[in-house]
């Protein structure tokens, strides 16, 4: 049983200021470089949780591409189905964090993903249909996203909308995904509804479930998650806050990995959301985008120690 990721794999460069950011000036801080990409990060988290994880992406024949492949292999993520193309540059993502580890601004160059075409998806059709689940992101073109859904058959497809801009690309297809993991802003775009209040979030999430999405897990930051399922499930879920937030950039990727982990393990929606929240907790307590401590055992420990059930 394996989970397949189709989407972004890139190099992340994160800068965290040592003091309050001074705009339009050089700020002393700490810089870290690592393999990244929304879908790749989700898949590495799954690999660290003990799930067989495979990845389809496009890399350049360059140093960044080699870094992505070597770090992924070291974590147990199989990149052998990905393409390495000469003459193109591996995608990159740069983020700037303030002294409290909150992201101020980010920039990405994902143009290499233009080479991950519907034809590439067609060539991976059997791989897609053999997966327990597929994870993708809208950094891919709209036609490629649609081809993934067309090719999946009965294989559940999960999507991280990534941002409000990318969510617009996925919005017309939102009801065809098995699982969606938006924040409230991305939810507003996917559903075409206001989400400024709790009632708005609930209505928007329910509308996506009514359109066909089986699992809508809305990330609410420190407030946890609101879940709407096709089976009528509607609930809020949260864990107690972590002691120290060290890096918030990987929390969303870990959250989706925890959700997919719970799904492929056959858990109830409540338990799967607990896995998602716990994975997010583990991520924010790490200096790295993906915690090197991520494991199924630590996931269980975190649920036990941070939930009201503990």
PLM-predicted stretches and their roles:
Residues 1-58, 63-77, 244-245, 309-310:
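Glycine-rich phosphate/adenosyl-contacting loop at the front of the ribokinase-like
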Residues 4, 27, 171, 198-310:
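Conserved phosphate-binding/catalytic region of the ribokinase-like
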Residues 46, 183, 252:
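Short, conserved phosphate/pyrophosphate- and ester-handling motifs at nucleotide-, phospho-/glycolipid
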Residues 74-87:
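A glycine-rich helix N-cap at a beta->alpha junction
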Residues 84, 95-133:
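Conserved phosphate-binding/catalytic loop of the ribokinase/pfkB sugar-kinase fold
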Residues 92-96, 105, 224-228:
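Short beta-strand scaffold segments in enzyme catalytic cores
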Residues 133-203, 223-225:
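Conserved beta-alpha-beta core of the PfkB/ribokinase-like small-molecule kinase fold
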């Amino acid at each position: 049983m394996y989970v397949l990721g189709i989407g972004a794999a890139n190099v992340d460069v994160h800068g965290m200021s040592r003091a309050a950011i001074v705009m339009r000036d050089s700020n002393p801080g700490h810089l870290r470089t690592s393999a990244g990409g929304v879908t790749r990060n989700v898949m590495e988290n799954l690999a660290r949780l003990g799930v067989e994880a495979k990845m389809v992406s496009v890399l350049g024949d360059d140093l960044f591409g080699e870094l992505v492949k070597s770090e992924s292999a070291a974590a147990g993520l199989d990149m052998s189905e990905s393409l390495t193309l000469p003459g193109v540059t591996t995608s990159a993502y740069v983020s700037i964090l303030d002294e409290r580890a909150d992201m101020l601004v980010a920039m990405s160059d994902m143009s290499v993903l233009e080479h991950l075409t519907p034809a590439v998806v067609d060539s991976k059709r059997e791989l897609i249909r053999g997966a327990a689940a597929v994870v993708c992101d809208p950094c891919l073109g709209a036609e490629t996203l649609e081809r993934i859904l067309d090719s999946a058959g009965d294989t559940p497809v999960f999507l991280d909308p990534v941002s409000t801009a990318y969510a617009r690309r996925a919005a017309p297809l939102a009801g065809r995904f098995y699982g969606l993991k938006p924040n409230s802003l991305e939810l507003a775009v996917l559903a075409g509804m206001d989400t400024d209040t709790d009632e708005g979030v609930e209505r928007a999430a329910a509308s996506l479930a009514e359109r066909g999405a089986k699992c809508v897990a809305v990330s609410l930051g420190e407030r946890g998650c609101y879940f709407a399922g096709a089976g009528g499930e509607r609930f809020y879920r949260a864990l107690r806050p972590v002691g120290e937030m060290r890096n918030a950039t990987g929390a969303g990727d870990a959250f989706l990995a925890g959700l997919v982990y719970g799904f492929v393990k056959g858990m109830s929606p409540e338990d799967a959301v607990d896995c998602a929240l716990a994975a997010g907790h583990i991520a924010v307590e790490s200096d790295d985008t993906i915690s090197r401590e991520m494991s199924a055992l630590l996931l269980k420990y975190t649920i036990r120690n941070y939930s009201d059930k503990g």
